[in-house]
């Protein structure tokens, strides 16, 4: 099987009530996913990025058979998500986050046994599988504690174990490290990338809020905005597609907005992003463009002439975040 997931023209429309008019209620039509097309190769770790409301979670829900598409088709493991739902669910693991989906008054082990029985797993096989999963996610020593005593990171580990209870070859993850501290996030990324993908050969599709996480983990990435894909490829391919040669990060004191427009008018400059003021009153200007090395002196000179103090600057190659900002726009959260 070359492609584990195939999506063709997938569309989902929601109708929301806006208020009352003569003759009844007015319905606002929101196209959450608009004729989406992509494939996820077998054994691949595929990332889906985009602003809030772009359609990431809606896509995950359609692929997991929770939502029915209004148009288009998708297959998971060769099975249709609209015509072969039970076959899709048998080979698919779905891992979300947060506090829902677990029984807090049960132990971690008992939670996993409950979900194993939903898959009609024999108790002996389930116990062996649970022991293996608890070891995989690092919860063996706390397996018999009540979930209500777990930290958020431990609950997220249990979510991962729950989604893998039936050993699915294909796994969907919706923001698996959201809101976790850096140490816990790093541990979970290692579980996902090393243990699940590399060692067990699972196909993984995930959404994430963190650009650097996607850049370091994903084999390929699709950026979605307004329900449609605007860029897709490896992290390097996406960075190359927006033709951002380099970026310059300058830490400065307060500056007039006219400075930003003046810098953007310089040759080779594509975009200037102000990353906001810190508590000490300083700001960071991120300048994206081509051959910026020759612009350093003119930019510094411009800032000084406008009474702006330059505290530091750093030039580097563009990151996935730089490409994302160029494609989606400044201020578009993911």
Task: Give residue ranges: language-model regions.
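Catalytic Walker B motif of ABC-type/P-loop ATPase nucleotide-binding domains
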Residues: 171-175
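Hydrophobic anchor residue at the start of the ABC signature
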Residues: 160
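ABC transporter nucleotide-binding domain
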Residues: 191-290
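Conserved ABC ATPase "signature" region
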Residues: 113, 117, 124-142
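Conserved catalytic motifs of ABC-family nucleotide-binding domains
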Residues: 167
């Amino acid at each position: 099987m070359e492609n584990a997931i195939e999506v063709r023209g997938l569309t989902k429309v929601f109708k929301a009530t806006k208020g009352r008019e003569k003759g009844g209620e007015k319905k606002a039509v929101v196209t959450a996913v608009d004729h989406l097309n992509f494939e996820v190769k077998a054994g691949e770790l595929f990332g889906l990025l985009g602003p809030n409301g772009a359609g990431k979670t809606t896509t995950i829900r359609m692929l997991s058979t929770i939502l029915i598409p209004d148009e288009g088709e998708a297959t998971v493991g060769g099975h249709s998500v609209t015509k072969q739902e039970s076959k899709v669910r048998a080979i698919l693991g779905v891992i979300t986050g947060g506090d829902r989906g677990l029984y807090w008054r049960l132990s971690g082990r008992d939670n996993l046994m409950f979900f194993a029985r939903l898959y009609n797993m024999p108790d002996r096989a389930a116990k062996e599988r649970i022991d293996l999963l608890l070891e995989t996610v690092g919860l063996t020593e706390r397996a018999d504690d009540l979930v209500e005593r777990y930290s958020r990171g431990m609950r997220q580990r249990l979510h991962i174990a729950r989604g893998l209870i039936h050993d699915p070859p294909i796994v969907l993850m919706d923001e698996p490290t959201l809101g976790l501290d850096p140490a816990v996030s790093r541990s979970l990324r290692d579980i996902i990338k090393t243990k699940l993908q590399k060692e067990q050969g699972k196909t993984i599709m995930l959404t994430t809020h963190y650009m650097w996480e996607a850049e370091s983990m994903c084999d390929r990435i699709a950026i979605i905005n307004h329900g449609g894909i605007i860029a897709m490829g490896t992290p390097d391919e996406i960075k190359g597609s927006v033709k951002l040669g380099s970026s310059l990060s300058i830490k400065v004191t307060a500056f007039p907005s006219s400075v930003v427009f003046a810098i953007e008018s310089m040759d080779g400059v594509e975009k200037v992003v102000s990353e906001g003021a810190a508590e000490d009153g300083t700001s960071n200007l991120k300048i994206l463009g081509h051959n910026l090395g020759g612009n350093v002196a003119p930019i510094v000179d411009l800032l000084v002439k406008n009474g702006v103090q330059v505290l530091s600057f750093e030039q580097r190659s563009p990151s996935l975040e730089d490409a994302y900002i160029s494609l989606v726009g400044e201020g578009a959260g993911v």
